[in-house]
Amino acid sequence: MSSNSVVYWGTGRRKTSVARVRLVPGNGTITINGRPGDNYLNYNPAYIAAVKAPLETLGLGTEYDILVNVHGGGLTGQSGAIKQGAARALCELSADNRKPLKTEGHLSRDPRAKERRKYGLKKARKAPQFSKR
């Protein structure tokens, strides 16, 4: 990457994961925390497809490299955070990209998170065994 090349930034969040995504003109390689993307995501096709989805929606799969710093959570949350961060970076690239990305749902934050444990219960909703006597 040359020092004068254009870089587009986007931040994504999912569950407890936070991803800072940079889009750089290139050939479509994905680098996550300094490792190749498919290696970092354990070669799981669902995670890899989720990361590439925003670029594929716009047909830019081989035009930009994705460089990511991500922390927190597991691979599901991290891949979702990277997807949202890449979509936000593509919106920064051009305002025309926003509508198709929004239609496909790449820009919306998934609000689902782990439910808190309540006192008197073993887990969030699991109650101790009921005894009549």
Curated annotation (Swiss-Prot):
Any one GO CC term of the record: cytosolic small ribosomal subunit
Record key words, sorted: Ribonucleoprotein, Ribosomal protein
Biased composition (Basic residues): 114-133
GO molecular function: RNA binding; structural constituent of ribosome
Biased composition, class Basic and acidic residues, residue ranges: 98-113
Keyword Ribosomal protein: yes
GO term, biological process aspect, one: translation
Cysteine pairings via disulfide bonds: none
Disordered: annotated span: 98-133
Family membership: Belongs to the universal ribosomal protein uS9 family.
Annotated HAMAP family: Ribosomal_uS9_B
Protein name (record): Small ribosomal subunit protein uS9
